[in-house]
C-alpha cells in the first residue's frame, strides 16, 4: 500500500491485514511535539479480539508538520512489514499472527488527517505482479481534480 497524506491534528493512522474491526495491525505517524521544531514518532500495535496489544513508539529520523504532504509506503512480505516516509525507511518489524486482511484508515479522539490518494497492489501471483505495475486508485480532491 502506498498513499499521500497530510496530518491535520496529531497523526495519520492506518490499518492493514484487517480481517474485521477487532483484528488488524495498526500504524500511526505522530507529531509528538508541535511547534517550530516538531518531533515525530511512529506508533505500531496489533489489535487482537478487539484488544490493543504490544504498542511500540519509535522516534522518527525526520520531522513531521501539519499540512505537509507525506508519501507513505507500507510493504508486506509474509510476516515482515516495512514502512517508509518520503522514500526513507522508518520502520521494519515482523509478526505472524495475522496472515491476511484488508487495509483502511482510522483516527482516534483528537486526531485527524487528509488522505489524498491510495495505491494498492497485490503481488502474490504472477498476474498480481503485472497488474500492480499499472494500478493506481485516485480519489477526487477538494478542488475537484484527481491526484
What function would you assign to each model-found segment?
Residues 49-73:
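Short, aromatic/His-centered strand-loop micro-motif at the edge of beta-sheets
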Amino acid at each position: 500500500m502506498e498513499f499521500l497524506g497530510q496530518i491535520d491534528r496529531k497523526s495519520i493512522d492506518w490499518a492493514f491485514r484487517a480481517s474485521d474491526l477487532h483484528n488488524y495491525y495498526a500504524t500511526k505517524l505522530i507529531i509528538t511535539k508541535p511547534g517550530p521544531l516538531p518531533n515525530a514518532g511512529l506508533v505500531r500495535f496489533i489489535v487482537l479480539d478487539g484488544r490493543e496489544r504490544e504498542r511500540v513508539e519509535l522516534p522518527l529520523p525526520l520531522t513531521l508538520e501539519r499540512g505537509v504532504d507525506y508519501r507513505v509506503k507500507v510493504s508486506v512480505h509474509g510476516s515482515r512489514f516495512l514502512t517508509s516516509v518520503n522514500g526513507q525507511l522508518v520502520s521494519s518489524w515482523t509478526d505472524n499472527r495475522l496472515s491476511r486482511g484488508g487495509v483502511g484508515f482510522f483516527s482516534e479522539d483528537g486526531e485527524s488527517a487528509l488522505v489524498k490518494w491510495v495505491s494498492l497492489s497485490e503481488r502474490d501471483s504472477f498476474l498480481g505482479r503485472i497488474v500492480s505495475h499499472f494500478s493506481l486508485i485516485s480519489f477526487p480532491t477538494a478542488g475537484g481534480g484527481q491526484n
